[in-house]
């Protein structure tokens, strides 16, 4: 059963193939940590959202419960070994561990969302910070002068 108003797209998160103020919501799950220029991607998402439109990000994050750290580190070290055993290639699983470690912590990502122009920014930790859901809203303001770089030549 399809939904006429629901659209899934695949593209460069830093240069979205969408006009300004064209989305009611944007969701990215376990993908932001793979984006090279996260600030640019967040700005592009804000421009693509209609005023009041919501962004929701589900991503691995940083532990908030220090008691979980030894178990988490041990578990993280197993990913490449299990990946090697199952697929014969440890490198994607090593990348997973490294990309999680390099991803901004909860407060840094919250600040990045605010810098990108989102309002009502916050986050909820899941599983003691193993993952977090960040959210923000495109502000209600006149953005007629804002330009999505993907469509700059069309404006």
Each model region followed by its residue ranges:
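A short glycine-rich, Lys/Arg-flanked "PGG" loop and its adjoining helix->strand segment in the class I
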Residues: 39-54
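Conserved SAM-binding strand-loop segment of SAM-dependent methyltransferases
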Residues: 2-14
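C-terminal alpha-helical "lid/dimerization" subdomain adjacent to the S-adenosyl-L-methionine
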Residues: 58-116, 122
């Amino acid at each position: 059963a399809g939904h006429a108003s629901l659209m899934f797209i695949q593209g460069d998160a830093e240069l979205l193939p969408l006009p300004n103020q064209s989305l009611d919501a944007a969701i990215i799950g376990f993908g932001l940590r793979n984006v090279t220029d996260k600030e640019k991607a967040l700005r592009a998402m804000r421009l693509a959202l209609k005023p009041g439109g919501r962004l929701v990000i589900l991503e691995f994050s940083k532990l908030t419960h220090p008691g979980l750290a030894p178990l988490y580190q041990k578990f993280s070290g197993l990913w490449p070994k299990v990946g090697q055993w199952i697929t014969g290639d440890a490198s994607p699983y090593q990348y997973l561990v490294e990309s999680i470690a390099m991803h901004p912590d909860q407060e840094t990502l919250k600040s990045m969302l605010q810098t990108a122009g989102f309002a009502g920014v916050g986050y909820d930790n899941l599983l003691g910070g193993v993952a977090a859901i960040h959210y923000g809203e495109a502000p209600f303001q006149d953005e007629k002068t804002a330009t999505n770089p993907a469509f700059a030549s069309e404006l």
